[in-house]
Design a protein with these regions (language model features):
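DNA-recognition alpha helix
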Residues: 114-122, 135-144, 318-326
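Phosphate-backbone binding and catalysis cores of DNA-processing enzymes
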Residues: 1-101, 135, 201-258, 263
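Core structural elements
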Residues: 1-6, 22-24, 50-54, 102-114, ...
């Protein structure tokens, strides 16, 4: 499929292009996201906060408007003003105090996709660079007094399986380094649906080789990646982090405001590792005073803020890998290559760590959708991946799979050749944000 459809791109657009089955879908994900962003219509909304003081006692706090009393969105300044008018000069009181304990469980050890995502977030490494350094750690590094040592298990895997020996070694390391309170029992993680499970999860080959013990034998990148893998694996076997959560509800008439605060009770796995995030972390309220239901409060000020809903974010390399994994597109051995290839082919460009389609990427994707819609369909590609897995497992005949695919693809190819006969597709010039000083147009 790749060679045939690539030949069509060569003839109709320009030489050097390719339309691999998975890379075409990866490019389409980026193009589709850009279309979502361009079609997005921001929606106005407002937030309203109140600063509340205790009557005759020290301690103030900020609460956020919730509703009257059911949850209500403030969609205009008029909505906010109607609430403020109702609250003017009126007393508040505490209508609810809820205290609870919240637990956070550690993330499982790395598989290929999550290693690439986390190395991108925390180490600013591209998927391709991550896999190159991981390959070095797997194949072996010269360790003083030890010779060449493979520091990690195989790095192309979608399995969460951990050997019993590694589980026991992790438990010993945790008890020795952090204390018995940080280890309860081995954690065995369930594999995700469709995982091939040929290899273990990515982990240190020898847990006893602490990162700092081998740091002087490693390059900076090798050390940082090894430390990330070691820490994630050890954290995956540690106890939960525990938090004390206090939720306050205050009301004035029918209008309800809420405030929540959480404080760490026991660090658990967070003593060594916390998973990175692609999105902004939710802001938590400041510590709250020790309030009782029915307690009187007075408002000392209000803060109203206008906001607009935001379009979906462009993919980072890490979030594109995650999207491919979630949709069943590609395999652990191909994620890094695919993300790199669509940039090398100039279908996608990276700016400020975010991926955008180029005019060429849009043209190629539109052409593929118009003439090879099944092939570039995400579900079709995921299903093809599943069929290829079954071929590899001996459950399906490869000739039958190929015959079934080629029958539909050949018909689409003939139709495309006929529809595009004699036509040459022009790629629009890319327009930048810079303005020409001479003519005033965008360059």
């Amino acid at each position: 499929m790749s060679a045939i459809s690539s030949a069509l791109l060569w003839k109709k657009i320009r030489k050097g292009l390719s339309a691999g089955r998975v890379q075409s879908v990866a490019t389409r994900l980026v193009v589709d996201r850009e279309n979502e962003i361009r079609a997005f219509v921001p929606q106005e909304y407002w937030t309203l906060d109140v600063n509340l003081n205790r009557a005759g006692k020290p301690g103030s706090f900020t609460a956020h408007y919730y509703g009257d009393p059911q949850k209500r969105e403030l969609t205009s300044e008029q909505d906010v003003q109607s609430v403020l008018d109702a609250l003017e000069g009126q007393p508040f009181s505490v209508t609810g105090v809820k205290k609870s304990e919240k637990k956070r469980t550690p993330a499982p050890p790395f598989i290929t996709s999550t290693l690439q995502q986390e190395a991108s977030r925390k180490l600013n490494m591209t998927p391709r660079r991550t896999m190159m350094i991981a390959q070095q750690l797997y194949e072996g590094v010269e360790i003083s007094g030890e010779g060449s040592v493979g520091l990690i298990t195989y790095m192309r895997t979608d399995s969460l399986r951990i050997s019993e020996e590694a589980l026991a070694a992790a438990g010993d390391a945790i008890r020795s380094r952090y204390g018995a309170a940080y280890y309860a029992e081995p954690r065995r993680y369930k594999p995700k649906s469709g995982a091939q499970d040929a290899h273990e999860a990515i982990r240190p080959s020898n847990v006893a080789l602490y990162p700092e013990a081998v740091e002087h034998d490693l390059t900076k990148e090798q050390y940082r990646l090894y430390k990330l893998i070691w820490s994630r694996f050890i954290a995956s076997q540690m106890t939960n982090a525990l938090y004390d959560v206090t939720a306050i509800e205050a009301a004035c008439g029918s209008h309800v405001f809420r405030a929540t605060h959480q404080s760490m009770k026991f660090s658990g796995f967070t003593a060594i590792y916390e998973e990175g995030r692609d999105d902004e972390q939710e802001k938590l309220d400041s510590p709250l005073p020790d309030l009782a239901p029915g307690e009187a409060l007075t408002a000392s000020g209000f803060d109203k803020q206008q906001h607009f809903t935001q379009p979906p974010a462009r993919y980072t390399e890490a979030s594109l890998v995650r999207a491919m994994e979630e949709k069943g597109v590609g395999r652990p051995s191909t994620y890094a290559t695919i993300v790199a290839t669509i940039q090398d082919r100039e279908y996608v460009i990276k700016k400020d760590k975010r991926l955008s389609p180029t005019p060429l990427g849009v043209v190629v994707t539109d052409l593929m959708i118009e003439h090879f819609n099944d092939v570039i369909d995400v579900e079709f590609t995921a299903n093809m991946e599943h069929q290829l897995d079954e071929v590899e497992a001996g459950k399906r005949n490869w000739k039958a799979v190929l015959r079934e695919f080629y029958k539909g693809f050949h018909a689409e190819m003939e139709e495309a050749e006929e529809a595009l006969d004699g036509k040459r597709i022009k790629v629009p010039d890319e327009v930048s944000d810079e303005v020409c000083e001479l003519c005033g147009r965008q360059m």
